Amino acid sequence: MASVSMRDMLTAGVHFGHQTRYWNPKMKQFIFGARNRVHIINLEKTVPMFNEALAELAKVGEKKGKVLFVGTKRAASESVKEAALASNQYYVNNRWLGGMLTNWKTVRQSIKRLKELEVQSTDGTFDKLTKKEALMRTREMEKLEKSLGGIKDMGGLPDALFVIDADHEHIAIKEANNLGIPVFAVVDTNSSPDGVDYIIPGNDDAIRAVQLYLNAAAQAINEGRNKDVAAVAEKDGFVEAE
């Protein structure tokens, strides 16, 4: 089962928080102390909390649930996309558009438009347009792909959010809270854990730390889905005798 050790976290720098002057008092219980005016996160709390979160993500995977990975800042953007693709899930890694969850009806219309433009770009429709019109549609398609490309095949609201940087993605967390969607989030010492169902106290800036969270999350989801496949095969008598 997917799990992360204390050594893994130390190597990735998960324990380094923000400068002490930027701290959020709501994170006090997860802080071990300070070194050179930088808060040190208590990994004795992070390790079991993260592993509990991974176990829950595996359950979402087992139920064929949809997980939306959210991380729009530069340190997380590419890794968020990679983790989502590696686990056949969905992502928002550019900019969170207000109402992405709470106004899904409108978002669905934009996704429909994106898919129409994608078809037009390959079926010869663009070739029949003037250069200016074709350019305008291409730009519209690229803009929509940038903001909605990671959710265009989601087909409805997600069953869980996995967020890198609770402070930066507070709008996404609030929308998920309003809809009762469980939130898994990395919460650094400058952030509030409010609204996060599965808190992962840790560094949300170091690329190695971000990759550690995301790789483990993707692995947990995949393991959950594979467990379900194995269970179905066994039930149907497809498991070969050893």
UniProtKB/Swiss-Prot annotation:
Gene Ontology molecular functions: structural constituent of ribosome
Keyword Ribonucleoprotein in annotation: yes
Entry annotated with the keyword Ribosomal protein: yes
One annotated GO biological process: translation
A Pfam family assignment: Ribosomal_S2
GO annotations of cellular component type: cytosolic small ribosomal subunit
PROSITE patterns registered for this protein in UniProt: RIBOSOMAL_S2_1, RIBOSOMAL_S2_2
Disulfide bridge map: none
Record's keyword terms, sorted: Ribonucleoprotein, Ribosomal protein
Cross-referenced CDD domains: RPS2
InterPro entries named among the record's database cross-references: Ribosomal_uS2 (IPR001865), Ribosomal_uS2_bac/mit/plastid (IPR005706), Ribosomal_uS2_CS (IPR018130), Ribosomal_uS2_flav_dom_sf (IPR023591)
Source superkingdom: Bacteria
Similarity section: Belongs to the universal ribosomal protein uS2 family.
Stored NCBIfam families: rpsB_bact
HAMAP family given in the database record: Ribosomal_uS2_B
Protein name in the entry: Small ribosomal subunit protein uS2
Organism annotation: Vibrio cholerae serotype O1 (strain ATCC 39315 / El Tor Inaba N16961)
Source lineage: Bacteria, Pseudomonadati, Pseudomonadota, Gammaproteobacteria, Vibrionales
Gene behind the chain: rpsB
